[in-house]
C-alpha cells in the first residue's frame, strides 16, 4: 500500500516555480510583451524554464553587464523567470501537467513546433496583472 501511495505522490507537478535562468538571453534583454520558453533546461526538473513578461536582462548576463540600464532587478527576475510545465498542448500527442496552487494554465506560445506550443503554468498574480 505504501508503494502505491509513493507512486501516486510522484505524479505531482514537479518543481513548477523553482528558479532558473535561461542559457540564452536575447541581445538587449527580454521584452515585457513577450514570453520565452527554454525547453531542455537542465536547471528544471520539468525541463522547461520560462521568462514571462520580463523587461530587461538578469544581473550578470552579458546584456546587463554591457548596459546597466537594461538590467532587471532580482525581484523582477524572481517574479518572472521560473521552471514551469506545459498544461495544455491542444490536440498534441504530448502530455500535459496539472498546475499547482498559485499558478494558472495560460496560453503562452501559439507558434513554434508542436513540442513547445501551448499553455503553461504561469504565476497567477502575473495573469491577473495582465488582464
Question: What are the roles of these predicted feature ranges?
Answer:
Residues 1-10:
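Sec-dependent bacterial lipoprotein signal peptides
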Residues 11-131:
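Secreted, cysteine-rich disulfide-bonded mini-domains of extracellular proteins
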Amino acid at each position: 500500500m505504501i508503494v502505491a501511495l509513493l507512486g501516486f505522490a510522484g505524479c505531482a507537478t514537479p518543481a513548477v516555480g523553482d528558479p532558473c535562468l535561461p542559457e540564452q538571453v536575447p541581445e538587449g534583454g527580454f521584452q515585457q510583451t513577450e514570453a520565452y520558453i527554454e525547453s531542455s533546461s537542465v536547471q528544471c526538473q520539468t525541463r522547461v524554464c520560462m521568462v514571462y513578461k520580463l523587461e530587461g536582462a538578469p544581473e550578470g548576463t552579458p546584456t546587463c553587464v554591457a548596459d546597466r540600464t537594461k538590467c532587471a532587478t532580482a525581484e523582477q527576475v524572481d517574479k518572472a523567470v521560473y521552471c514551469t510545465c506545459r498544461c495544455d498542448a491542444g490536440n498534441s500527442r504530448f502530455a500535459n501537467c496539472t498546475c499547482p496552487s498559485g499558478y494558472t494554465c495560460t496560453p503562452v506560445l501559439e507558434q513554434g513546433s508542436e513540442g513547445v506550443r501551448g499553455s503553461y503554468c504561469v504565476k497567477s498574480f502575473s495573469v491577473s496583472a495582465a488582464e
